[in-house]
From Swiss-Prot:
Its EC number is 5.3.1.9. It is found in: Cytoplasm. GO terms for molecular function: carbohydrate derivative binding; glucose-6-phosphate isomerase activity; monosaccharide binding. The gene is pgi1. Pfam families: PGI (PF00342). This is Glucose-6-phosphate isomerase 1. GO terms for biological process: gluconeogenesis; glucose 6-phosphate metabolic process; glycolytic process. The keyword Ribonucleoprotein does not apply. It catalyses: alpha-D-glucose 6-phosphate = beta-D-fructose 6-phosphate. Gene3D superfamilies: 1.10.1390.10, Glucose-6-phosphate isomerase like protein, domain 1 (3.40.50.10490). Catalyzes the reversible isomerization of glucose-6-phosphate to fructose-6-phosphate. The keyword Cytoplasm applies. InterPro entries: G6P_Isomerase, G6P_Isomerase_C, Phosphoglucose_isomerase_CS, SIS_dom_sf, SIS_PGI_1, SIS_PGI_2. Pathway: Carbohydrate biosynthesis; gluconeogenesis; Carbohydrate degradation; glycolysis; D-glyceraldehyde 3-phosphate and glycerone phosphate from D-glucose: step 2/4.
Amino acid sequence: MAFYRTPHDVTALPAWKALQQHREAMRGFSMSEAFAADAKRFDQFSLSACGLFLDYSKNLITEQSRDLLVNLANEVGLQDAIKSMFSGEIINASEGRPVLHTALRRPVGDKLSVNGVNVMPEVHKVLNQITELVGRIHDGLWRGYSEKPITDVVNIGIGGSFLGPELVSEALLPYAQRGVRCHYLANIDGSEFHELSANLRAETTLFIVSSKSFNTLETLKNAMAARTWYLAQGGSEAELYRHFIAVSSNKAAAVAFGIREENIFPMWDWVGGRYSLWSAIGLPIALAIGTANFKELLSGAYTMDQHFQTAPFDKNMPVLLALLGVWYGNFWDANSHAILPYDHYLRNITKHLQQLDMESNGKSVLQDGTPVKTDTGPVIWGGVGCNGQHAYHQLLHQGTQLIPADFIVPVVSFNPVADHHQWLYANCLSQSQALMLGKTREEAEAELRAKGLNEADIEKLAPHKVIPGNRPSNTLVVERISPRRLGALVAMYEHKVFVQSVIWGINAFDQWGVELGKELGKSVYQRLVGSLEDSAEDGSTQGLINYFRGKHRG
């Protein structure tokens, strides 16, 4: 039976039991000793694909470890699961949907049926619509109510309608097209809208309202605020269609808002929000970098799709990263994973990967609704390069928790300043090296003696300078961030998340946990404004409601 119909108990598989035994045998394993004993370790545990280079040699693994992890992937039926996803089977079982964000990056001429209908012509029709709209705006042909060209585009959306597009448009800022600035409005906090709108002119601003339902609270409230602002700045209802377009599956609601039907770009149920930057949700990306570069982004993701489907698991970048995550999460008690980009333009990749990973694999039941028997998705956290070294890297080096890390770094900078990039690259490599090597008590004492400290002071200070080392990390290197390489990088992490969900037997494509807070939020709001007088379900929430109301009564 398909993995999404009858999920396995992964802990009962022979490969899982073999990994448990192997973990016991690895208790004394030292990465430093492994490198000293094997001059080819780097070559054995590194690979190139799709413009990316992955060094995973600084991990708590041997060739046997990799073989056993690959056996696990085989025993859970990963190859069949990959085929199921790419062919459009209903792998999102709880919502009864296929999962086909990969269709959005397939080339013209490909065929893919959903419910007996080839969806590829519609996919490329929308891509052509994006191309046409972007061309009109970049050429100054799309005019605002005062007949001036559009200079600013504001994407109103939250979650997947914001995090992915923001990541890509900022990561590819060196490819930005002149004449149009792109902005993002996500939070319902009025301060965000205030700060953004203060620097805009309504007559030259275009808003993109991105919401599948056209009913997402934060997005709809911000869209209404933008509409009120537009009217207050001199715009009219009659000309509103020049300043608002939508990406939504709810055409009726978008039209009722004042958006013309021809300016509503569709969304499909088979594309989840956190996987949607490749769709019309990526319209602000195309506006920022141009459609030629947007298509390069899609092409890069497609090359990773091909690699994922065809490469043997022991040479498959997403599969290897996923297996390493399972290895640490389920056999080494790691609860989190750090994403550490050493590139200013990639500073938002951690936020996107937080949603991608934690919303996908933050699950506690199998596809059939029975409880899992393993830990599942980790906490994803981190931040940009050298800044983190002066903040939280201390915990990575000397804390009590094992926290695997991904270092991401380009070889070439877009903006070389003196020898800054050489230092940036050196810092990235030295951090992964320090995590692995650590510092022994003997090394700490020798270091202090060399500084002239007496033995009593050395005895006191040396324990504080000991760094355990033997802490794992991956290093992902790109020659330089480009649309194609970025597409491959993001797609790689998408597939990594999917592989882990297959191993754990969970559904990576629903997010029911998000809904409860939304439902409760409505009644909390009603109590805040006084339209609902009965007490909240618990004393804490009611107490906080009373505090708010007390302050607002003056």
